[in-house]
Amino acid sequence: TRDMAEAIFHVLGTHAPYGTYDCTGSGAVKSWADIARAVFEAANGNGDRVVPVSTADYYANAEGPVAPRPVHSALDLSRLESVGFNMPDWEEELREYLKTLKPLLLN
C-alpha cells in the first residue's frame, strides 16, 4: 500500500538503524474478525454477516495440520515512530481506500 511504501522510503531515506520495523495501520487493536467486519460493513453494509470463530473452535474444526497462532498478535509501531514516521489510522485508511475502489467496481 501507499502507506507501507512511504514508511519504507522514510526508513531508508533517514538511514534509520538496521532492524525489523513493524508496519501496519495505527489505531485501535482489533481481531481479524473485527477487521473483516469493518471491511464488509464499509464495503456493502453487511458487517453483521461476519461471525467470529474462537481459536479453540478453529483448531477443533480444522482438517489436517494447523499452524500455531499467537494469542496476541498486535504489531508494535514504536520503532517506526522512533525514526519519525507515524502510520495513519487503519480505519480511516480503509474508508479512503473503499472510496477509491467503489467506482472501479461499478464499471
Question: Would you name each region that the model predicts?
Answer:
Residues I8-L12, V39, L94-L101:
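Hydrophobic "lid"/C-terminal helical patch
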Residues S26-K30, D34-L75:
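Terminal hydrophobic/aromatic helix or amphipathic segment near a protein terminus
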Residues P68-N107:
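C-terminal amphipathic/interface module of NAD(P)-dependent oxidoreductases
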